[in-house]
């Protein structure tokens, strides 16, 4: 464990630090989220024997244990595998069937596919600046059967300048320092640094400044803790 990170976390959550450290080494929980564009809950519950209790974050998802990426129903887009709490962000957005939505940092596509499942005559723009990740995003959208959408691979400033106030809702799952990945990858614990946090915070601030020009309602999702993380960034950008 990175000593600088450990010291920082002890300052933020002194009474919970032991539980937090234990949680990093606990088995990673995963959920299977139903894709309403292709199926319904009753069908999946009748076919997928590995579904466990319903997710507390999404009424259309179940906790699962194991590896099901090669399951035929996953391969054909009937469900999407993601961490349970990840689906809570889109649920909080109150997506309406006719909304025009922008997912500004969209790859690999879990939240975009969830948004698409709530749209009827609305439209989704899913953007990913890195071309290779944009290809993964497009592949996942095709697998999930999403139609009323487009995938872009643009700088956020260029995209948002071209589409001022065009969106009813915007989601920014901004690149961050990787603290949310520490449970998955040991390297994220070792490579953490304050310099990287400052770099990520500057990048996030730029993305948010671009995004607000294109929005009606804005939703920010970050896993970074501290004054240079979610709270401080929101205070700088939200009136």
Model segments located where?
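S-adenosylmethionine
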Residues: 1-239
């Amino acid at each position: 464990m990175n000593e600088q990170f450990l010291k920082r976390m002890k300052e933020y959550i002194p009474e919970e630090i032991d539980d937090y450290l234990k949680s990093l080494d606990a088995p990673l929980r995963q959920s299977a989220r139903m894709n309403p564009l292709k199926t319904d809950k009753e069908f999946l519950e009748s076919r997928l024997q590995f579904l466990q209790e319903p997710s507390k974050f999404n009424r259309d998802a179940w906790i699962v244990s194991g590896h099901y990426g090669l399951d035929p129903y996953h391969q054909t887009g009937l469900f999407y595998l993601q961490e349970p709490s990840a689906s809570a962000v889109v649920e909080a957005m109150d997506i309406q069937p006719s909304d025009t939505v922008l997912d500004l940092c969209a790859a690999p596509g879990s939240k975009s596919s969830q948004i698409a499942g709530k749209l009827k005559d609305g439209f989704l723009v899913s953007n990913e600046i890195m071309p290779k990740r944009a290809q993964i995003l497009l592949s996942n959208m095709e697998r999930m059967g999403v139609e009323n959408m487009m995938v872009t691979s643009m700088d956020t400033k260029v995209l948002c300048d071209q589409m001022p106030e065009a969106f009813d809702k915007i989601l920014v799952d901004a690149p961050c320092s990787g603290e949310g990945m520490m449970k998955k990858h040991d390297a994220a614990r070792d490579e953490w640094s304050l310099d990287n946090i400052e770099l990520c915070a500057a990048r996030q601030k730029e993305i948010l400044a671009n995004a607000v020009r294109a929005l009606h309602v804005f939703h920010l999702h970050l896993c970074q803790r501290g004054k240079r993380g979610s709270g401080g960034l929101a205070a700088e950008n939200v009136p």
